[in-house]
């Protein structure tokens, strides 16, 4: 976080100095906090959080006491009084690692309230309520939604099938429709790999020898133009996988690439999809269908700013 300038402090709060000649206690103001869920922080709400002040604990085997408006609590108090924007990073435990954490940047917040209350140890602690600024893309909210779906605490909106692959994939492929009332696709066979006819003729650049059949004659991994005499058509009408449901877009976020791969001494054709840019969680994957040799134009429904109105 320090490398990207998000949070450079070694503690759960970062502050900067400000010029305020009329307020001696306002020379430092909080600009970033990390809510780790410790110190009685309340972090379950995706649009707000309760941040506990600093001090008054026996973290270093000292005597517990009431928290005071001093040291690290002063920058938080200054941000509250001046209604200054504060960056918030949510810290969550990584379930895949014993001592690992996951940090989620959740945008900018504003401290809207500050009060004192009795803590779990019987001493007074400071509480700061931070509310997320409007018109920001969800971050921690998406994380919490996914957790609730996995744990069965809530149902994903528009969910039709929990696993379209019926266990064929390592990860479940959820079928979701948030656009219309269509209940699901027509009957088809879910496959995890492309069912194709083997390309019997090895490309001319590969020597026709045992060495060539082991792929050491050519070092090309991706091959856009294949030396194939007949046209190739990939149809997902009767069988396919998750790529079967990827829609067209005039502003795609993935692109397709043909791949020629040696398998058991023979060349086979595959299609791979690659990200064109950063894709946030729960974002629909779309690619440009391109131009077809026949069939005419079809109406485009991508509704992006660069929509051409038709494709094909």
UniProtKB/Swiss-Prot annotation:
KW Nucleus (keyword) present: yes
GO cellular component labels: chromosome, centromeric region; nucleus
Keywords per UniProt: Centromere, Chromatin regulator, Chromosome, Metal-binding, Nucleus, Zinc
Subcellular location: Nucleus; Chromosome, Centromere
UniProt GO MF annotations: metal ion binding
Residue ranges of the TM segments: none
Binding annotation for Zn(2+): 250, 300, 302, 307
Domain called SET: residue spans: 126-290
Every Pre-SET domain range: 163-219
Pfam families: SAD_SRA, SET
Listed GO biological process terms: chromatin organization
Limits of the YDG domain: 1-132
Listed name of the protein: Putative inactive histone-lysine N-methyltransferase family member SUVH10
Annotated organism of origin: Arabidopsis thaliana (Mouse-ear cress)
